[in-house]
Amino acid sequence: DICGVQPMTGPTGLIFAMRSTKGTNRDINNSAVETFFNEVDTEHSSENSADGLASNDQTGSNPGLLADGASNYTIGGQGMTTAQSEALGDGSSNHFNEMGFSIEKVTVTAKSRALKAEYSLELAQDLKAVHGLDAESELANILSTEVLAEINREVVRTVYKIARPGAQNNTATAGVFDLDVDSNGRWSVEKFKGLLFQIERDMNAIGHETRRGKGNILICSADVASALSMAGVLDYTPALAGNSNLLPDDNSSTLAGTLNGRIKVYVDPYSANVSDNHFYVAGYKGSSAYDAGLFYCPYVPLQMVRAVGQDTFQPKIGFKTRYGMVLNPFAKGLTAL
């Protein structure tokens, strides 16, 4: 639910990413600048390769800082004249500017998990006679549940580890949203709505920095989910449609509900809930299995193996699985986990 799934067909695999660049595909030094990620430079197609024409680099990224007469936000390239366009390519210093692409890869290698259990025939006989339970089935359930739970926690902890700090602007302390300071509400419901606004800001930041889409998943502690729920319940004219559908419970489903009809909220049942400080992690997962920041790559599904001790003739069972885990190449550079 919180990461993409790309099955592996062998013990090692490759994840490819294509980047559009300014420059030529023959650039072996890989110094070409990526484009289509943030705002395009209006100068590139209005200049020759030597940047010898009259257009200037655009400056500034926040129109909100634009002031009359200020030069902190400029247009940049505004096109060539007809004469300049006709002259392109007529000399060694007057070539067309070029575009290209690069194919980059990240290697993912399968890793393994394994557990075993042994039991005596006498134990199996007594367990069946007294409790009506099958020893092999019970141990198999224990082993498989443990392995799958460990993989699940590895995924969640990996998400926490690779997540970038949020709340970087308009907060007293960068990375911390203080309900008493940053929200500045008169009562709890207003402070909780301030928290919701900060969550939306972090969701917007994901869309701005990744250019994939606005954040749509939230992992948080039960108290944070309860605060979001109460923000809608306590308000007599709720503007937060859908918040009353949040049902945070550490001991039931980790999916608490949907926030604003769009954001799926998951509760981490193992976070330190009885604490002065709480957390949330905002993320994005697209409709495609390839549109995520983290990929779980199953290779060999959980397999059960039976054996009998060569000396004791007592039964043994074991479980093994193999899988990989890797970041999206666009998420944090070309770094495999």
Give short role names for the model-derived ranges.
Residues 166-190:
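Acidic/histidine-rich catalytic neighborhood
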Residues 13, 20, 165-175, 244-250:
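Eukaryote-specific, cytoplasm-facing alpha-helical/coiled-coil scaffolding segments in long proteins
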Residues 5, 14-110:
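Assembly/oligomerization interface modules of large self-assembling protein complexes
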Residues 1-9:
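Intrinsically disordered, low-complexity regulatory segments in eukaryotic proteins
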Residues 26-34, 126-129, 151-156:
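Short, solvent-exposed secondary-structure capping/transition elements
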Residues 8-11, 108-111, 210-212:
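Extracellular/periplasmic catalytic domains that process cell-envelope and extracellular macromolecules
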Residues 1, 76, 83, 89-93, ...:
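Sequence/fold signature of self-assembling virion shell proteins
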Residues 7, 135-136, 151-173:
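Short, glycine/acidic-rich hinge or "gate" loops at secondary-structure transitions
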